[in-house]
């Protein structure tokens, strides 16, 4: 069950592991990247939502991108989230990322001011024109306040050859299904990845290409097992892996912010990281961490 899509399988939006002073902990982050590779993850996204893109400056991101590309060394694909409300910052990080040798960029729709479809179209087209790299759209209306409709996605794909995919983080699989139906008319190889962890199977049934989701930080092996079982037609194993993922979804309910929950779970799995996230986001409490440990202990 393969396709000609450029991005297919299981992709991890990596946490950005930090020291207590807010600087990046490259030692533990490198170990985390190695773990993803050893598990068989198809690619990693730097500076997505879980990677706290909104709170880190372009210079720090560029340095981190160079580190990650060197660390990964071609063992999996490297994607970079270039999202920002300032288009100049988007273009600057896109240029730095392209120079570093990443495989693709991911651009979230402009947030805060709720752009019209025409504004969003101009924005994404400007991002695509600023790079020769493949660009993946990022639709997360719960956080951005605006939705990339199936029709808009199809228009962008048809008019910009290097817009080659979308991460559709919408808790309604019918939206993703409609995106697939619309965009495949203009680009049969367009990649459609779901942002919700438990949607891998229904995404694939609907004609999509997999997931780019947070729990891959915690148990990448489980997601890889699901993907490989699906590809080979081993549906008994696929169901078992999907059931585990369904159970792990309760981790998201343990903390005030999903980023804290994921960092806490990575720590509980054995990587001795600091679970700090950038203020003003709420930090993980001791009680929340104990709840995470309890969930993962079962």
Where are these predicted regions, by residue range?
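Catalytic alpha/beta core domains of metabolic enzymes, predominantly
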Residues: 143-246, 252
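Generic non-transmembrane alpha-helical segments
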Residues: 67, 71, 130, 182, ...
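A general structural signal for well-ordered alpha-helical segments in protein cores
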Residues: 29, 61, 65, 90, ...
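Active-site beta->alpha loop and helix N-cap motifs at the rims of alpha/beta catalytic domains
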Residues: 3-12, 17-147
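C-terminal alpha-helical cap/extension of soluble enzyme domains
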Residues: 6, 11-16, 35, 39-41, ...
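Short helix-capping segments at alpha-helix termini
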Residues: 70-76, 100-101, 131-133, 158-162, ...
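A general structural signal for stabilizing positions within well-ordered secondary structure
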Residues: 1, 35, 96-97, 157, ...
């Amino acid at each position: 069950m393969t396709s000609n899509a450029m991005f297919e399988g299981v992709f991890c939006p990596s946490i950005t592991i930090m020291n207590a002073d807010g600087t990046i902990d490259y030692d533990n982050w490198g170990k985390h990247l190695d773990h993803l590779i050893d598990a068989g993850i198809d690619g990693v996204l730097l500076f997505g939502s879980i990677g706290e893109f909104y709170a880190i400056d372009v210079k720090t991101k560029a340095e981190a991108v160079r580190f990650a590309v060197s660390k990964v060394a071609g063992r999996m694909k490297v994607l970079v989230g270039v999202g920002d409300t300032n288009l100049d910052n988007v273009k600057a990080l896109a240029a730095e990322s392209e120079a570093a040798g990443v495989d693709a960029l991911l651009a979230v729709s402009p947030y805060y001011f709720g752009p019209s479809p025409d504004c969003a179209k101009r924005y994404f087209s400007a991002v695509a024109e600023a790079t020769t790299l493949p660009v993946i759209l990022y639709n997360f209306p719960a956080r951005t306040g605006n939705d990339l409709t199936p029709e808009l996605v199809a228009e962008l794909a048809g008019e910009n050859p290097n817009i080659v995919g979308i991460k559709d983080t919408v808790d309604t699989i019918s939206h993703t299904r409609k995106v697939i139906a619309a965009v495949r008319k203009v680009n049969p190889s367009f990649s459609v990845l779901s942002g919700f962890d438990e949607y891998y199977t229904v995404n694939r049934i609907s004609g999509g290409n997999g997931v780019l989701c947070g729990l891959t930080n915690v148990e990448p092996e489980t997601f890889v097992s699901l993907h490989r079982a699906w590809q080979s037609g081993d549906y008994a194993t696929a169901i078992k892996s999907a059931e585990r993922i369904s159970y792990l979804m309760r981790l998201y309910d343990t903390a005030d912010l999903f980023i804290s929950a994921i960092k806490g779970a990575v720590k509980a799995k054995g990587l001795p990281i600091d679970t700090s996230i950038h203020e003003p986001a709420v930090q993980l409490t001791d009680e929340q961490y104990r709840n995470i440990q309890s969930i993962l202990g079962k």
